[in-house]
Amino acid sequence: MKISIRFFNDREVRALWDDDQSKWWFSVLDIVGVLNDENDYAKIRNYWKYLKAKLKKENNQLVRATTQLKLTASDGKKYNTDTLDSNGVVELAKHFPNNRAMKFLDWFLYSDTSIDGQSKKKAYTLFES
């Protein structure tokens, strides 16, 4: 798997490329931190735990869409963490009705500096060469 780290407003958003499924998986905790503008890992983790339980209770598909993958943490060790694909990230952002969520989605979906934007640029460059 290929690892990619992008920055939204100087905040890290980690992603892994899955060759088997040909798609990116994004760290849920990184996205929750961005959407809540929170730096405290414990608060981010607790909020995701709360939101995940609430969504599970509502039978929301988003919880079933999460996949646990190993990502490198700030301590340098790899831990299993919840990840979502692009569609899941968009759905997750809908549960954060604030301006940050809209700005994040604009960056995530439409920006040339987004992960997909970078991938498309690279693909076009390879295709044209």
Predicted regions, residues:
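An anion-engaging/catalytic patch
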Residues: 1-129
